[in-house]
Amino acid sequence: RTLCIVVDTYQVNLVESKEILEKCGKVAVIDHHRKGVGFIENPALVCHEPYSSSASELVTELLQYVGERDDKPNRVEAEGLLAGIMLDTRDFTLHTGVRTFEAAAALRRYGAETERVRQLFDVTMVEYNAKADLVEAAQMYKNCAVSVSGEVPPEARVAIAQAANDLLTIQNVEASFVAVQVGTGVNISARSLGAVNVQVIMELSLIHISEPT
């Protein structure tokens, strides 16, 4: 009878715990990424909106139609959702629509404060230095900024996505790819201003890597 709600991904390989997913009798999927391979099989419910700015936007929309006022997000939860929207839209500058701002307004009504949300993005000196090193290592390839690096400190892995975001602010950069060694694997963060479909590129890269040589 347990319901497992998977948010911000539809792929089995990207969930936090495959064991929990497999043990739950019912699964609901809430995601905004373009549908590709590896979709979770036979979900009881799917909320899939590729044109939505973020999974946080979708969750906020759903919460407005569920339960009574007491069931709505508290201030901390609302600020977490607003942080998700701000992260995926780069502070409402990318991939935004009318529904994005309506969701943000709803979260504001639930008590979210942008000042406190902004503080959630503060970084340590270790994280900042790791991000700076990744940005400095980037090279240009066909209007794409590409950075490849060895391992970064485990506590600074958030710098991988942050570096990919920062590379988009460089003139003439339409997409960014930051690849960092993590143990025996590679963590890749890809970002785009819209002209380059980085999700398709990443999917093709995974297919190529998995093919026998």
PLM feature spans:
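Hydrophobic helix-and-loop "lid/oligomerization" segment in the mid-to-C-terminal part
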Residues: R1, L87-S210
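N-terminal small/polar loop signature for handling phosphorylated ligands or for N-terminal nucleophile
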Residues: R1-K23
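Hydrophobic/aromatic beta-strand patches that form the interior of the parallel beta-sheet core
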Residues: I5, K26-I30, L45-H48, A145, ...
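Short glycine-rich anion-binding loops that position phosphate/pyrophosphate groups of nucleotides
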Residues: T9-V12, H33-K35, V152
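A generic local secondary-structure boundary/capping motif
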Residues: E16-E19, V46-P50, D71, E136, ...
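Short, structured coil segments at secondary-structure junctions
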Residues: E22-C24, I40-P43, S205
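Short alpha-helices
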Residues: H32-A105
